[in-house]
């Protein structure tokens, strides 16, 4: 399964064969976002996020507009929970300057 949003560093993307770039690429993204919908199981999405991290993802955001919570996943760090939507998420050193204003999802 693919995430709702993903990003791969250009250097890693360029290492793929052209034919792999033109289809569902066999690469784990560096960054993913999953946005929970009413039909999604939170536990299944959390499991999916863990799989991304196990496969080399560096930053993952599980955004739950239903409960207005966001779960931030990073390698070798406990999952950080943002408990309100009055904050901005930052791409940090992986995506300098990238921010997502959670208030826009209310």
Go through each PLM region and give its residues.
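C-terminal interaction segment
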Residues: 1-55, 59-106
């Amino acid at each position: 399964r693919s995430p709702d949003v993903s990003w791969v560093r250009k250097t890693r993307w360029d290492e793929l064969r052209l034919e792999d770039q033109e289809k569902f690429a066999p690469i784990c993204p560096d960054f993913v976002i999953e946005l929970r919908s009413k039909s999604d199981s939170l536990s299944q999405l959390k499991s999916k996020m863990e799989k991304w991290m196990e496969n080399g993802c560096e930053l993952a955001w599980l955004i739950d507009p239903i409960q207005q919570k966001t779960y931030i996943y990073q390698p070798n760090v406990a999952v950080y929970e943002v408990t309100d939507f009055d904050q901005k998420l930052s791409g940090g050193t992986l995506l300098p300057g990238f921010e997502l204003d959670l208030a826009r999802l209310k």
